[in-house]
Amino acid sequence: MAKRRLSKRQVDRIRERQSQRLDTSVAAPDGKQLGSEQAGLVIAHHGKQVQVETLDNSDDSPRRLRCHLRATLGSVVTGDRIVFQEDDSSGIIVAIQPRSSTLVRPDSYGKLKPVAANVDQLLITIACAPEPFSGLIDRYLAVAENLHIRPVLLFNKLDLLQSDEIDSAIANKVAKLRTLYTSLGYRCIDTCAKNGDGLDELRNTLQDNTSVFVGQSGVGKSSIIKKLLPDQEIAIGALSDAIDKGRHTTTHSELFHFPFGGDCIDSPGIREFGLWHLSPKEVTYGFIEIRDIAGLCKFRDCSHTHEPSCAVLNAVEDGSLHPERYENFQRIVQSLDDVNMQG
């Protein structure tokens, strides 16, 4: 069989990976020589150091150790599968394995930085308090679709829907949101972290996957995770009565192993990841029902706002495209234009 020729991009990628793994006898910060290369998983990020869990200890349970980062590696985030070398008590990460997915958010300068890697599914958590907004939900869905991460909508705090604490209009809004996203084919799970309702179904969904919980502050993400990880010390913030907004309680990124199988990455940065890195075309792809019909428009560069023979506008008019979804789609596209103008 003839040898397959590699493309220039493949050759460059191979050279880059090889350069990252050269000089395997690199010295530790204290001058000691390091051992052979080992595979590991980044389970926590603490400033300039990360905590790594070994992956290739077939006879022993995984070990955990602090590792320094090579300056030439770039960003290392929780969820990364890496190659490291160790001395007696710590190690140095010498390579990052290719990622299946990367969640990013802008830093204080507007530059995108990764916050989590190799995520399989996004648990979009919704509750009646604080009041949910479909625009935020649709932003999460658009990111998940483009990253090919499976989205699951988690409707939490069901106990409040049966109480007098919640206005009936908000309760109806939550019910309508659930109906809308179910009709689009998204999986919706009803839970109550307080009494444990729905957690068995949630455990089955989390098993054998690496998941991230996202959503507004105060919807109960940390409370749910604590129910699933009763032996872990996870900070929980109460809903603020004064401003009706939950406080961010997680201060660093960390990966937890569920006892029933599967992992969870929790990080304050993940809650803020956005759509700055998506183009209008990718936003269109992120709305599954718009994606399916946008190619039927008369004009290839159709903005789906005013053009004649626009399949998207026709779908809104005949009721096959929900008007709220269309409005959110247009708002997101406009927000990208605003960011580009500011840049």
Swiss-Prot record:
Keywords: Cytoplasm, GTP-binding, Hydrolase, Metal-binding, Nucleotide-binding, Ribosome biogenesis, RNA-binding, rRNA-binding, Zinc
A Pfam family hit: RsgA_GTPase
Coiled-coil segments on the chain, per record: none
Enzyme class per UniProt: hydrolase
Protein's UniProt keywords contain Metal-binding: yes
EC number(s) from the headed UniProt entry: 3.6.1.-
UniProt KW Zinc keyword: yes
Main location: cytoplasm
GO biological process, one term: ribosomal small subunit biogenesis
Domain of life (superkingdom): Bacteria
PROSITE patterns named among the record's database cross-references: ENGC_GTPASE (PS50936), G_CP (PS51721)
Compositional bias annotation for Basic and acidic residues: 9-20
GO CC entries: cytoplasm
InterPro entries (alphabetical): G_CP_dom, NA-bd_OB-fold, P-loop_NTPase, Ribosome_biogen_GTPase_RsgA, RsgA_GTPase_dom
Signal peptide: none
Residue span, CP-type G domain: 109-273
Residues the entry annotates as binding Zn(2+): 297, 302, 304, 310
Positions with a binding annotation for GTP: 156-159, 215-223
Required co-factors: Zn(2+)
Transmembrane parts of this sequence: none
Subunit structure: Monomer. Associates with 30S ribosomal subunit, binds 16S rRNA.
PANTHER family: SMALL RIBOSOMAL SUBUNIT BIOGENESIS GTPASE RSGA, SMALL RIBOSOMAL SUBUNIT BIOGENESIS GTPASE RSGA 1, MITOCHONDRIAL-RELATED
Family: Belongs to the TRAFAC class YlqF/YawG GTPase family. RsgA subfamily.
The protein's name: Small ribosomal subunit biogenesis GTPase RsgA
Organism the protein comes from: Saccharophagus degradans (strain 2-40 / ATCC 43961 / DSM 17024)
Gene: rsgA
